[in-house]
Amino acid sequence: MGLETEKADVQLFMDDDSYSHHSGLEYADPEKFADSGQDRDPHRLNSHLKLGFEDVIAEPVTTHSFDKVWICSHALFEISKYVMYKFLTVFLAIPLAFIAGILFATLSCLHIWILMPFVKTCLMVLPSVQTIWKSVTDVIIAPLCTSVGRSFSSVSLQLSQD
């Protein structure tokens, strides 16, 4: 119990060669990915998901568990994270990809065939609507506002302090 003086040898056998004992998976450089296979996150959308054991469980300097407990909990954390991710992707990846594909196809279709023609039609009609609106404001609203303004301009207030 206490501060570790020896370096513990922990080995986890996984099919990923990029496993790190420090913080979960180590992400290789893009050049290394290009040679070894397909880069599944080329735009680094999920770079914030580099979550390791030390990010979740941490013991302060004043209180440490037994070294073997710390090593076993670290190994169990990494194994359970790896296995649960694989298990969840087996059951959720295909249905969620299917739903996302339907959603994006629907949104693309609506944007291409409904929204953009509507916007273009509005932009074509707007110059004539603008001309009609300018005529209505010049004929009806401008004289009304002018007469109300003249009526209120003749009102004067005098304050007296008695």
Swiss-Prot record:
GO BP terms: basement membrane organization; caveola assembly; endoplasmic reticulum organization; endothelial cell proliferation; insulin receptor signaling pathway; mitochondrion organization; negative regulation of endothelial cell proliferation; negative regulation of skeletal muscle cell proliferation
Principal cellular location given in the protein's record: nucleus
InterPro entries in the record: Caveolin, Caveolin_CS
Cytoplasmic side: 1-86, 108-162
Intramembrane segments: 87-107
Function: May act as a scaffolding protein within caveolar membranes. Interacts directly with G-protein alpha subunits and can functionally regulate their activity. Acts as an accessory protein in conjunction with CAV1 in targeting to lipid rafts and driving caveolae formation. The Ser-36 phosphorylated form has a role in modulating mitosis in endothelial cells. Positive regulator of cellular mitogenesis of the MAPK signaling pathway. Required for the insulin-stimulated nuclear translocation and activation of MAPK1 and STAT3, and the subsequent regulation of cell cycle progression.
Protein name per its UniProtKB record: Caveolin-2
